[in-house]
């Protein structure tokens, strides 16, 4: 009886989580199959990066969208940067790789918090604009640089990049769009 009571308390959480996942999947412009493929590819890319035995000073973050991989973070030197690219390109299913890692020390926790706040501010501004579907765009921030990826038309891409470049705190915007046909 106690187990039944405990399990029934979990039901609302399971239902809410399932509804959230379903809504996010439905809003994404990629097909469900593409979303699953990207999720699987992201796991394989992460594994390849961890197996590449990059030095502990390297902080490489991968973002996968439409089979394309965007690398951000910090690496100690160009050799490590090239090793990260090589590791990603060895993964079957990677269509294209943008290596936007920067040479230097890893960013501080304070900068990571600032970047999270900046990304949230950008997403809010994009969400409030009537001509942008936030579900089509991924926003990645790294040391006040903003990296945009997603499925857009050339005009949408220009408009979003321009809007993001005017957000307070943004030092630079780099786009890695997949263009709609």
Residue ranges with predicted function:
Residues 4, 9-181:
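N-terminal targeting leaders
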């Amino acid at each position: 009886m106690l187990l039944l009571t405990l399990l029934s308390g979990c039901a609302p959480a399971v239902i809410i989580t399932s509804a959230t996942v379903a809504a996010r999947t439905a809003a994404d412009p990629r097909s469900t199959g593409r979303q699953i493929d990207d999720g699987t590819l992201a796991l394989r890319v992460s594994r390849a990066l961890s197996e590449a035995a990059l030095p502990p000073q390297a902080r490489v973050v991968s973002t996968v969208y439409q089979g394309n991989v965007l690398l951000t973070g910090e690496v100690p030197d160009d050799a490590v940067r090239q090793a990260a690219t090589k590791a990603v390109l060895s993964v079957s299913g990677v269509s294209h790789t943008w290596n936007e890692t920067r040479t230097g020390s890893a960013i501080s926790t304070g900068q990571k918090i600032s970047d999270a706040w900046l990304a949230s501010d950008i997403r809010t501004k994009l969400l409030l604009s009537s001509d942008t579907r936030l579900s089509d765009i991924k926003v990645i921030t790294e040391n006040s640089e903003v990296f945009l990826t997603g499925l857009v038309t050339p005009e949408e891409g220009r408009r979003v990049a321009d809007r993001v470049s005017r957000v307070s705190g943004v030092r630079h915007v780099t786009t890695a769009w997949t263009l709609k046909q």
